[in-house]
Amino acid sequence: MRIRLTAGTTNLLTMDLLMELSDAIADAQNRSRGLLLCGGDKFFSNGVDLDWALSQSSEQIRAMFLELGKCILQLMECPLPVIGSIKGHAIGGALALLLACDYRFGAKGRVLI
């Protein structure tokens, strides 16, 4: 099963995206024999939406990072082979998601990690 992170033109990690990712990982474990995690067309992800984070309470920020941690653990503990497909940069939490994959494959060229 392929899971593609798509969140606008900057592909930022948001609470909604992370909750959808968590659900998709759980669904993949029940319906497929492998998992491919992909980012956007130009880059994997710009990481956490800092503008959002600056406008939130510490409780909301903590909840979002707990959700990110949940996704990371799901990827690490997934019984399926998990592959991270990297095109372009992967910043912050996005890099953590890729590091939780069993295998990572990147496109040729220079990238920012």
Regions found by a protein language model. Name each.
Residues 1-38, 73, 77:
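Conserved CoA-thioester-binding segment of acyl-CoA-metabolizing enzymes
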Residues 11, 42, 111:
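Glycine-centered loop/turn positions within well-structured domains
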Residues 12, 45, 93:
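Residues that form or flank phosphate/diphosphate-binding pockets in enzymes
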Residues 19-20, 31, 39-71, 90:
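Glycine- (often His-adjacent) and acidic-residue-rich active-site loop
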Residues 35-39, 82-85:
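Short beta-strand segments at enzyme active-site cores
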Residues 37, 49, 97-99:
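Hydrophobic/aromatic residues within transmembrane alpha-helices
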Residues 72-113:
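Glycine-rich beta-to-alpha active-site loop
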